A protein has these predicted regions:
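C-terminal catalytic/acceptor-binding lobe
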Residues: 169-224
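N-proximal low-complexity "stem/linker" segments adjacent to membrane-targeting elements
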Residues: 1-45
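Anion (oxyanion) recognition and catalysis
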Residues: 31, 99, 200
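Short, high-confidence coil segments that cap the C-terminus of an alpha-helix
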Residues: 74, 102-103, 204
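Short, conserved alpha-helix that lines the donor NDP-sugar binding/gating region
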Residues: 44-70, 196-197
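Polar low-complexity intrinsically disordered regions
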Residues: 11, 83, 95-97
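Conserved catalytic core of nucleotide-sugar-dependent glycosyltransferases
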Residues: 87-178
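Short beta-strand-to-loop acidic/aromatic patch adjacent to the donor-nucleotide binding site
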Residues: 63-85
Length: 224
């Protein structure tokens, strides 16, 4: 049986003890699941730059360059942020679901700081944005009864599996902003949103597995 080749993209430079435990437990289990793996870890203060750096981008390589300059063979990229806390089985479930459903972009869920909403927008509701200045993020209640994967407008890069061929379909820089430009409003999108909308234009939609919810470690200031 051929091994599945996964490159783990880990943007950041500060990794907590909880992340270290999660990561160590995961890499210990990978060989048992017939997975050949590698890691790409980069840091930059600019989120767009660090995502492209994790993919081996070259600032003078031109728009037609491919991830890792086409020199690295892989089947999937797994993006994990430095503040995620997870169990190995959550990754294996994500990978298996992507294979079973032939899904090119698949993510689990994680709460954003504040703990009330996930880093996921299902509907690109422009009218909601015009009134509020942000899009409506999913809540735990929104997904409490959902068991099957479903398509979303965009989700965070924090726990994201991407099949080979997606980034390869895009011009460099592979991760770049797009714009909301309508009715006098002009705003730049986030890294995840820009990438996923450009990928969708190439036929690669983004899906969520609502049964996979990982931890998101954030500091809290306690005060009276």
């Amino acid at each position: 049986m051929n091994k599945t080749k996964v490159i783990f993209c880990l943007p950041g430079r500060t990794f907590s003890d909880n992340f270290l435990k999660s990561w160590t437990n995961l890499v210990t289990e990978l060989p048992k699941h017939n997975i050949k793996w590698a890691m790409s870890q980069k840091y930059h203060v600019n989120r767009y730059f660090v995502c492209n750096a994790c993919l081996g981008g070259n600032s003078i390589g031109g728009k037609n360059q491919k991830p890792f300059q086409g020199k690295v063979d892989y089947d999937y990229l797994m993006w994990i942020d430095s503040d995620q806390v997870f169990e190995p089985q959550q990754f294996f479930n994500l990978l298996n679901k992507a294979k079973e459903t032939n899904t090119s972009i698949l993510s689990g869920l994680y709460l954003m700081q504040g703990g009330e909403v996930f880093a996921t927008v299902e509907d690109w509701d422009k009218e909601f944005f015009k009134k509020n200045g942000y899009f409506k993020f999913l809540t735990p209640e929104d997904v409490s009864s959902r068991k099957e994967i479903f398509k979303v407008s965009y989700t965070g890069f924090g726990w994201l599996l991407v099949k080979r061929g997606v980034f390869e379909s895009l011009d460099y820089p592979w991760v770049q902003p797009t714009w909301f430009d309508e009715d006098g409003i002009r705003e730049m999108t986030t890294t995840d949103c820009g990438f996923m909308h450009r990928a969708a234009e190439k036929g690669f939609d983004t899906y969520i597995d609502p049964t996979i919810i990982v931890g998101h470690e954030k500091s809290t200031i306690l005060q009276v």
